[in-house]
Structure formats: structure tokens, C-alpha cells
Amino acid sequence: MKNYNVSDEPVTKVAVDIDDIKDTSREKSLNKECVFLMAGRMIYRKGLDFLFDALMRIPQETRYQVRVVGDGPELEHLRKRCKDNLNLSEHVHCMGSIPYMEMEKEYACADVFIMPSIRETTGTVLLEAMSKGIPVITINKFGGATLFDENTGWLYEGNSKEEY
């Protein structure tokens, strides 16, 4: 490489075009519910069953909502699980697939982005959320864990739903 005058520094590919990011400033109110956003393909490894187990531990009267965006083979199972459980049905909205441009509105409403994947390197949605200044909750086992400090997100070990 040195013969070609090329730096030996590794090349980093950024999956999120920060020039394309729109202003998603959002007004926060201390009186409103906390909005969590999760986006991705609805498959087992995304950890949604694990997330739903953790959500069922939150008291019913807590003011929050979880907006789940994406499609896949697990979507109907997740919708049924929400419908069958009162603690989830009032708080979790499984929206299915939405147009990419609609995600801007979802990010604008979100207070926290959740990436509960049990096997994921670094998802593009994680980078998108971070680029919009949204704090992230994710597992402390894969690529996403290297992107955070205590000011930008929360990591959990992924050993139990109680920890989550």
C-alpha cells in the first residue's frame, strides 16, 4: 500500500448518509408519555419476545408507548401477543412496514430508540437514531455497544429480561 501512497488507516464505511438527515427537532413535555421506538425486520433474532417479556413487568399505569416498525414472519405473532395481554395492548403498537420517509416522523416522536436484538452487529437503524440525537438501549455484546457512553445510551448485558 505504501508503494501506492495509500494510507494504512482502515477505511470506515458509514451506512447513514448524514447529509440526508432532516431536522427532527422535537418538543419534549414532562407531562407526556415516554415514546420508545424499535424498527427492524420482525424475526426472532431481533429480540422482540425478550422485549415484550420485559415490558410486561412495567406497571399498567405507567405512561409510555412502544412503536414497533417493520415487517417479517414474526409480526403476526407479536401482534397477537400484544392483543392477548392487556399490559401490552395499551402500550405497544406493531405498525408493520411503513415508507422510509415516514420513519422521519417516527424518529421525531421518539424519546428512546430500542434495539433488543440478540444477534446483531450494528444495525443501520441504530446509526440513524444516534444521528438524530435519540438515546439508544441495546445489548452490550455486539458492535452497537462500542458506539455509546453514559450520555448517549444504555447497555444491558442481555442475560435476563429483569435486567432489561
Go through each PLM region and give its residues.
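Donor nucleotide-sugar binding/catalytic pocket of nucleotide-sugar-dependent glycosyltransferases
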Residues: 1-23
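Nucleotide-activated donor-binding/catalytic signature segment of Leloir-type glycosyltransferases, i.e.
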Residues: 79-98
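Conserved acidic donor-binding segment of nucleotide-sugar-dependent glycosyltransferases
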Residues: 150, 154-161
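Short alpha-helical donor nucleotide-sugar binding micro-motif in glycosyltransferases
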Residues: 97-98, 105-110
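Conserved donor-binding/catalytic core segment of Leloir-type glycosyltransferases
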Residues: 29-46, 52-55, 67
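Short hydrophobic beta-strand element within catalytic cores of glycosyltransferases
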Residues: 135-138
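Aromatic "clamp/platform" in nucleotide-sugar-dependent glycosyltransferases that forms part
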Residues: 118
